[in-house]
Design a protein with these regions (language model features):
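Catalytic, metal-anchored helix/loop core of enzyme active sites in primary metabolism
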Residues: 1-66
Length: 66
């Protein structure tokens, strides 16, 4: 499934937001959990699907305010 890709993309955005002082450190896992629970993860995603999931996850992680 695509959960590792979702985790990675959400984590990268959350850390960027933390370093920019937009969120607190303890909000990083909240953003990751939100993305994992809201992005649909196919059981065997294609490369194109993974790229789309990455874009969707980064957008959601940027917009989510824990």
């Amino acid at each position: 499934n695509a959960v590792p890709a979702i985790f990675n993309a959400a984590n990268e955005v959350a850390v960027e937001r933390f370093l920019a002082k937009e969120i607190r450190y303890l909000e990083i896992p909240q953003i990751i959990e939100h993305c994992i629970s809201h992005i649909v993860s196919p059981s065997c995603p294609s490369l194109d699907q993974l790229f789309q999931i990455d874009v969707e996850t980064r957008d959601l992680a940027q917009r989510h305010n824990p």
